[in-house]
């Protein structure tokens, strides 16, 4: 059974953001603008995306 994944792209800079937001971007495997990361769709990843929603964009919501 294939696990669901979510693709996200960084669209905002972490400059002048709180350290926790910078750490969240690193946890999402993002570090530069317009980089795309594909992660397993879990509640913890969704929470991290919600925390930095102003800095990222979800590209594919449901990919199996």
Swiss-Prot record:
Keyword Ribonucleoprotein on entry? yes
Q: Which GO terms describe its biological process?
A: translation
Pfam name, any one:
Ribosomal_L30
Signal peptide span: none
Q: Which family does it belong to?
A: Belongs to the universal ribosomal protein uL30 family.
Question: How does this polypeptide assemble, per the annotation?
Answer: Part of the 50S ribosomal subunit.
The protein in question is named Large ribosomal subunit protein uL30
The taxonomic lineage of its organism, from the top, reads: Bacteria, Pseudomonadati, Pseudomonadota, Alphaproteobacteria, Hyphomicrobiales
Gene that this sequence comes from: rpmD
